[in-house]
Regions:
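Structured, helix-rich domain cores that form ligand/interaction pockets
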Residues: 1-290, 308-342
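Helix-turn-helix DNA-binding segment
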Residues: 295-300
Length: 342
């Protein structure tokens, strides 16, 4: 049973930003995966020329402390600018497509594939040039000369977003225990000196994964900077690939995530724990195991304190602020690639 005094309209508003983006440019000649030895050697030569070209065009922009040109896990060459724009090209793995059509498997599958009921088709990855950056901390100006020359013969509709991190910040001490994420299992939970510091929903390799974490504490740990007020961030990491002119509705994913009423912490951990139990079982049950004097004291606190500071629904923040943020990102990418913006 829930006490109605805990419920009220949201007073902690969220603020949305795009925290990280990865986009791909069509580049068939920069893919190393091919069954043709002649084509492989030809593409390898093109990769070497591209590496030399990047070192020339970006010579004043590259981070001297980064091992420039070394391979990454998926690409032959990896470069990083001073403002943390990552450029990778030369895909070393193919694009894999799962086939479940029974007729195709029966006609072309191996004995093992027929038994498993699926087979895989492998093709060259023609999106072999990748750019990754954080729009909050960097722009694409430092690499615009490279992108303009690289994509001069491309159609803007062929630029693909491979990953997009959508962040919603709440300037309040959120209680991670007071959240619900439908259809996504809780993953790793990281604890800090004050309790839960980060909680994940969804698998690491899934198309969508949520992370709720103490942004203030993260900034202290990473940068030694204290912003002076509480800030919790709900971050959606989406690996749903899409073209710039066909953006998926991430709001449907955010609709899975809900803050219970009273999700803002009071600063009194015992009071917050009692409040959480009272939300589920009622105040009398939450106080039942306490000594009479302690129970009376906390019952009085419940009457005196205002628990009506609730958190705005994340999907509402998304639908209010994402369209503008996405349009700004779209303009930034297209402008950096040399397309005229009307």
């Amino acid at each position: 049973m829930q006490d109605g005094s805990f419920f009220a309209p949201a007073t902690v508003e969220g603020s949305l930003s795009l925290d990280r983006v990865t986009f791909l440019l069509l580049s068939p000649s920069l893919s190393l995966w091919t069954s043709d030895d002649v084509e492989y050697r030809r593409n390898q030569q093109k990769l070497e020329k591209m590496a030399g070209y990047i070192q020339t065009v970006l010579k004043d922009e590259l981070d001297p402390d980064f091992p420039q040109g070394y391979p990454s896990q998926l690409f032959r060459y990896h470069y990083r600018t001073l403002d943390d724009v990552d450029i990778q090209f030369g895909s070393q793995l193919p694009k894999r497509k799962k086939i479940t059509d029974a007729d195709i498997i029966e006609a072309f599958g191996t004995v093992e594939e027929k038994a498993e009921g699926c087979m895989y088709q492998y093709n060259p990855n023609y999106y072999a040039f990748r750019v990754e950056y954080n729009p909050n901390k960097a722009s694409l100006r430092s690499v615009s000369n490279l992108l303009e020359s690289f994509s001069c013969n491309q159609n803007a509709s062929l630029i693909r977003i491979a990953r997009l991190d959508v962040a919603i910040d709440f300037n309040a001490p959120i209680m991670p225990q007071m959240v619900l994420c439908e259809g996504m299992r809780k993953g790793n939970i990281h604890y800090g000196p004050k309790g839960i510091q980060t909680i994940y929903f969804g698998a690491n390799k899934s198309r969508n994964q949520f992370r709720l974490y103490d942004k203030r504490q993260e900034m202290i740990d990473k940068d030694g900077v204290d912003i002076g007020h509480d800030k919790w961030r709900l971050e959606l990491q989406s690996r749903e690939s899409f073209c710039l002119d066909s953006v998926p509705d991430h709001g449907k994913v955010f609709q899975r995530f809900t803050f219970y009423d009273g999700a803002v912490a009071t600063g009194d951990w015992k009071l917050d724990m009692i409040r959480r139990d009272a939300m589920n079982y009622g105040l009398d049950v939450a106080l039942r195991s306490m000594p009479p004097n302690t129970a009376t004291r906390y019952r009085k606190l419940f009457k005196e304190r205002n628990f009506k500071q609730n958190v705005e629904t994340p999907s509402l923040v998304y639908y209010r602020e994402f369209p503008g943020a996405m349009e700004r990102l779209r303009c930034d990418i297209l402008s950096a690639c040399g397309f005229e913006m009307l």
